[in-house]
């Protein structure tokens, strides 16, 4: 009975973590480029009383074993990198990735991060940056006399503008994107950014539209891939599982009470 208490408690703990994950998904339903997270579970250690295949009698073997589990725990949180919905913004510096890939970002400490959020801006230094002011790599520098409504970004990432003294567009550079063998192994650091890890593998940089890379879509943003209906259903299931485990604790407690009262009867 004591084992049942701890087993059910592990179930409640796991489901609480599950609800926390679902709540995070729902809170980011409008976050640009956000990828939903799914909690994965695994069972805990088993206590074996009899193993399958051991002698039952002198001439027979046990066809089945006798094992009692000790509950569950969160094994991992899997980030689902499905394509989010495309939303038109008509802003020339908004660029979505359609397909695989991440934008490479230079952080203030000199390290690199990666993002699917293409809501870019042009800062006071005339450089293409993220909403947080981090440089997009390779660096794109706009000339002083560029015409703001002339910015074009091709599917292959080529950035062009017109200047006051010429009607011909000038190429400023090309946005590259990076992909990973295991993008789910990237480490989220907030602000829609990810860091490379040993689990994700090293970045594979390339030109948009080539070698398995996605293409760029100017004037469009990729929205969150969270489905409110799906998350609400998952939350109801998690809530019921939490409730059932709490009932198991109550039942085990009642059984302990009955056992404790045996001497008094």
UniProtKB/Swiss-Prot annotation:
InterPro entries: Flag_bb_rod_N, Flagellar_basal_body_rod_CS, Flagellar_FlgE/F/G, Flg_bb/hook_C_dom, FlgE/F/G-like, FlgG_G_neg, LlgE_F_G-like_D1
Protein species of origin: Borreliella burgdorferi (strain ATCC 35210 / DSM 4680 / CIP 102532 / B31) (Borrelia burgdorferi)
Quaternary structure, from the entry: The basal body constitutes a major portion of the flagellar organelle and consists of four rings (L,P,S, and M) mounted on a central rod. The rod consists of about 26 subunits of FlgG in the distal portion, and FlgB, FlgC and FlgF are thought to build up the proximal portion of the rod with about 6 subunits each.
Localization annotation: Bacterial flagellum basal body
Any one Gene Ontology cellular component term annotated for this protein: bacterial-type flagellum basal body, distal rod
Leader peptide range in chain numbering: none
Entry keyword Manganese: no
Alphabetical keyword list: Bacterial flagellum
Pfam families per the UniProt record, alphabetical: Flg_bb_rod, Flg_bbr_C, LlgE_F_G_D1
Residue stretches spanning the membrane: none
Primary localization class, coarse: other
Gene: flgG
GO process terms (BP): bacterial-type flagellum-dependent swarming motility
Domain of life from the UniProt record: Bacteria
Family statement drawn from the similarity comment of this UniProt entry: Belongs to the flagella basal body rod proteins family.
SUPFAM superfamilies in the cross-refs: Flagellar hook protein flgE (SSF117143)
Name of protein: Flagellar basal-body rod protein FlgG
């Amino acid at each position: 009975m004591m084992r049942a208490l701890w087993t059910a408690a592990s179930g409640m703990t796991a489901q609480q973590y599950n609800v926390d994950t679902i709540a995070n998904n729902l809170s980011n339903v409008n976050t640009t480029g956000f990828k939903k997270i799914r909690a994965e579970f695994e069972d805990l250690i088993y206590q074996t009383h009899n193993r399958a295949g051991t002698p039952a009698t002198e001439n027979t073997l046990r066809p089945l074993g006798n094992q009692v589990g000790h509950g569950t725990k969160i094994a991992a949180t899997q980030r689902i990198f499905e394509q989010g919905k495309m939303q038109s913004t008509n802003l020339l510096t908004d660029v979505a990735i359609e397909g695989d890939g991440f934008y490479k970002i230079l952080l203030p400490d000199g390290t690199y991060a990666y993002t699917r959020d293409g809501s870019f801006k042009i800062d006071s230094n005339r450089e293409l940056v993220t909403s947080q002011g981090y440089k997009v790599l390779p660096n794109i520098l706009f000339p002083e006399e560029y015409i703001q409504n002339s910015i074009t970004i091709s599917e292959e990432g080529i950035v062009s503008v017109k200047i006051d003294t010429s009607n011909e567009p000038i190429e400023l550079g090309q946005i590259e994107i990076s992909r990973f063998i295991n993008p789910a192994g990237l480490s989220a650091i907030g602000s829609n950014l990810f860091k490379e890890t040993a689990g994700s593998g090293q970045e594979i940089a390339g030109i948009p539209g080539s070698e398995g890379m996605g293409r760029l879509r100017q004037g469009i943003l990729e929205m969150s891939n969270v489905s409110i209906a799906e998350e609400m259903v998952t939350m109801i299931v998690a809530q019921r599982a939490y409730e059932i485990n709490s009932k198991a604790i109550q039942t085990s407690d009642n059984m302990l009470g009955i056992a404790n009262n045996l001497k008094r009867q």
